[in-house]
Amino acid sequence: MERIQVIDNIRQLGLTTLPVGSSLFLYGSQARGDAHKGSDWDLLILLDKPVLTGQDYGIGYPFRCLGWDIDEEINPQVYSQKEWSDYSYTPFYKNVEQDKIVLL
């Protein structure tokens, strides 16, 4: 599947499954443009709440299912907006913030 089609599928799934106020970003090699055939798709999902609850951890599952359906590896990471901002001192946070592409 073409890159733009994968991005469109991810975006459409986000529109139909994520709670209002959520943000969805693509990061990593797919966002930087240096991905190769077989590279995974790294997603950051931020929920508009201070802390995640047990239910929130399942929010990424539909994205994994999409990946299985289209034969791509999709790896969603889910955080609350507050929890994500608390990681601002980490190299992971800095790399994601540098590379990310807004999908929603």
PLM region spans:
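Catalytic core of pol beta-like nucleotidyltransferases
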Residues: 1-25, 31-37, 47-104
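Short beta-strand->loop micro-motif that forms the acidic, two-metal-ion catalytic signature
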Residues: 42-46
